[in-house]
């Protein structure tokens, strides 16, 4: 029984299956953690959703910003852009079933036995773990409810960018969503910067990667995240694992076997080598 952590799949089904074949992944015995962004930009978003769903309880995933954007497009809130390559998913005969399954997936995973936390973008240094879990439950509750289109319509935006326990309503949900699915940089006081997408070597000096600020979570739990392909899986402190290595941009799909911290990679087999970026959620 092994636990495997895989970075952003982005519709790269062939690479995902090849990576799982490297370790003879067995869904009856092993567990697969996925950092989110299952869909968009790669060639096989529809088949990725079908495959991941078919693995049932062997999968522990979190939602990413592209997954949320798909939900918004399907709900008629956002526009379908050709570069996302999700048109076949939107018109698939099982689209309703897949979308309803997707919106009921977690936005945060915590395993107390493994001392492991996973979120697509990370955990703000302004939160301790109970606060992160509380905020995740709030987002998950609205996404799985009949009111989810109201949330999807309100989630786009960069403000508020500073945590306060007094935040409420849609503003609180937007902040939490930005932390879990969009965050890269913070100011020294912990405020989110939602504009800079450059690697740390090219970022303004006022900004720090969220993982370089003192963390209330990372002292006790390891944190695994995706989202930030330009990191190339490098430059994080001990106990923080960056797993998005840009497969859909022509890079690699990366897997970490948690049991022995061994990495496995699968080079991109797709012709899609656009410049890295993300939906401005």
From Swiss-Prot:
Function (record text): Hydrolyzes diadenosine 5',5'''-P1,P4-tetraphosphate to yield ADP.
Family, per entry: Belongs to the Ap4A hydrolase family.
TM helices/strands, residue ranges: none
Name of encoding gene: apaH
Keywords assigned by UniProt, alphabetized: Hydrolase
UniProt GO MF annotations: bis(5'-nucleosyl)-tetraphosphatase (symmetrical) activity
Pfam families, alphabetized: Metallophos
Tagged with keyword Hydrolase: yes
E.C. designation(s): 3.6.1.41
Name of this chain's protein: Bis(5'-nucleosyl)-tetraphosphatase, symmetrical
NCBIfam families linked: apaH (TIGR00668), PRK00166.1 (NF001204)
Superkingdom per UniProt: Bacteria
Catalytic activities: P(1),P(4)-bis(5'-adenosyl) tetraphosphate + H2O = 2 ADP + 2 H(+)
PANTHER family, sorted: CYTOCHROME C5, PTHR40942
